[in-house]
Amino acid sequence: MITEEKTINEATIQESNTEERGQDYLVAELEHHNDNTLDYKEDSIVEEVSTNEEEGVLRRRDVPPETLLEERSGSPRHEGHQAPPEMDPLARPSEFERDLFGSDPSYPDDVYDVAEQIKIYGGKTPFDEPRPILEWGYPLYSEGALGRTYTTFGEKNLLRPQLLVFGDFRSAVAFNDNGAQEIGQLAARLNLNVDLKLTSTERIHMFLRPIDKNNNFLRHEFFGNDHGEFDFVFDGNIEALFFEGDVGAIQSGLTDKWSTYDLPIAFGFMPLLFQNGLWVEDAFVGGAFTIPAKNSPKFDISNMDVTFFAGIDKVTSAAIKNADGQIEDSKSNVFGVTAFIETREGYFEGGYGFIDDKRDGDQLSDFDYHNLTASWTKRYGGKLSNSVRGFWSLGQTPNGSNTQTADGFAILVENSLVTHKPLTLIPYANFFIGVDRPQPLVRGNDGLLKNTGIAFETDGLTGFPKLDSSAQDAYGFAIGIENLFDLSRQVVFEFATVQPFGGQSETIAGDQYALSARYQHNLNDRWILRTDAILGILGNADNLSGIRLELRRKF
């Protein structure tokens, strides 16, 4: 009786409360019983539902339109109603194409291991990575919250200074026969970078090579004309010193207002590299700025950068030499513009440059010339990666009876096959043809074929022999295969040739052939072992050969 009386009283009270609030509020209760019991109560204004007193059922007054999106909550009011999403007037719905969708991948032979999947994110452990020899301010690759910052350049471009000194030390032993002479030597080279980071976008960088100068390295010859001699070389000159930053970020700091643009800049004694170093690879005194990250739906351009640059000193071009045939790096200026464009599932690079010969006189002057370049890189059918590069030097009219040093064009075609191991096993076949005297814009004595094959590049340390890389009045190719294994080793085998037009040109005495090989192995995270070998057969000239062993220490 007590229970029954209590139940009746509670029901009476609840019915009374419902009548009092019936004009304004409704209480809906949902009890759902399964493994977990869910009790749901919702107080809401009665505007969208009606009550059938006879059945005691809540019903909608109006059925919602079909375009209305619902997120059902268990309540008859469905408060999750949303309006249809708005579409930009420039956008259009696309047609559904069933062929573009496939079933999920199936791996019947692989058992899904939850623990192994978690390790991808949570199983990381620290390792003893190489450290710079000097870290001041805060360490490189540090974790956790950012450290102390300063408002020296403004609250929106915070100063957080960091000084790093890093680089590598190279030492090699080599037996080189360049045809004219045979040398056995032990040589060394030190690359030293000093980087002062100011803000997240601004820094000052300096590069030094203290133990080599003018291609003379710290070395000891144990075979050759200077047998038994030790050459100690010290060079206190700076190889590069420049400022790099972003005008937009600097403006934000100075005005305390966020800028709406990016404008990267650099100036000083600065290095530049374009077209993988084939067109420009040098450090000169000058400046550059870039208009970055542009796009054009109309022309199917997903990303585009345009860079303008100029140099007024230390400009090295093989077209500007003195009477002894040495490059005059202080006698010319360079001005240019280059663009990088991602479009139509490919990559385009194009550029224009002008070398201004500053020399006046009756002997050597007026060696100015224009330089154009363009390239297109794309993968075809998932089987072939291809790059086509063009270089054109024109407009040079030297004074008197001096011979042109930059006038002609070259076309390079680089191909590699996409194998079942596309990142590590790479067969390649690169071809070239050059007419007259094509020249890079700025890159010293190296020719346009530096990256065509390993037979066309030296080592920058021992004077390792190579085939002629000028591509002047010649054609040829380099065919080889590269294997990177598990990315800890590299093996390359290559056959290359240079064929001058008519069997002989002004710069190439005859046909050239070479077999080359390279082995490289990272012994650990600091030491790298590398060996190179070449055997060259030269028409109308002495043959060449070389073998070398190098150890490189990173720090």
Which role fits each region the language model picked out?
Residues 1-182, 193:
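N-terminal periplasmic/intermembrane-space "pro-region" immediately following the signal or transit peptide
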Residues 116-127, 158, 181-309, 547:
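Outer-membrane beta-barrel channel domains
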Residues 149-165, 195-205, 247-263, 294-307, ...:
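Short loop/turn motifs that connect adjacent beta-strands in outer-membrane beta-barrel proteins
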Residues 153-155, 191-193, 242-244, 288-292, ...:
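Outer-membrane beta-barrel architecture
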Residues 264, 270-449:
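Signature for the C-terminal beta-barrel architecture of outer-membrane proteins
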Residues 340, 349-378, 387-402, 439-532:
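Outer membrane beta-barrel transmembrane domains
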Residues 542-555:
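Outer-membrane beta-barrel "beta-signal"
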